[in-house]
Amino acid sequence: ITWLSPLQNENYREYMLNSPIMLQKLNQNKLLLSREELNFWPQREPLWDAIGVGNMKDSEEKILVLVENKSNLKELRSKLASKNENNKRLILDTMKETYDELGIKGDFNKWFDTYYQIANRITFMHQLMKKGYKVKVVFLNIVEDYMYNNISKTQWVDEYCKMLNEIIGERFVPRDILIIDLKVHEDK
């Protein structure tokens, strides 16, 4: 994986996929994505904690890796906050389209009133895959960080199972999503 953000020489800046700098970086790495292909979402897109481009195994085909980092269980919960009615409508329509196309049985209301950030990441992945891109979304959870939030792997697993059951209708991790638990401090 070639990481495009966050980079030390850019002061660890996070990017939206549609930012001119990120589109240029993606294109330079042979992942040809245009702003028009992102028109399923308003101009103000989610900021990704990390964005990378990799090669598919035994192929020249590229894969887009989008990372969302979590260090606190409370960060899993969020609501759609857009005040612009046109933007809100576009977001809800795109999320509902994703929900329907994936055949999800969970509570759609939880997508925008309880677990919005997680659901919009799933939506981005699905919409890009519909356009022919290979995409992986990584939820990177910080585990047992006794210097900040001492959350165990068990706590993360329990919370994700609960969330997935509510938004997906089952306790499984959707295909092309990876949940990684990272222990940042090995010794106390």
Model regions: which residues?
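Conserved catalytic cores of phosphodiester-cleaving nucleases, focusing on short active-site segments
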Residues: 50-52, 63-71, 121
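Non-catalytic C-terminal interaction segments of nucleic acid-processing enzymes
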Residues: 119-188
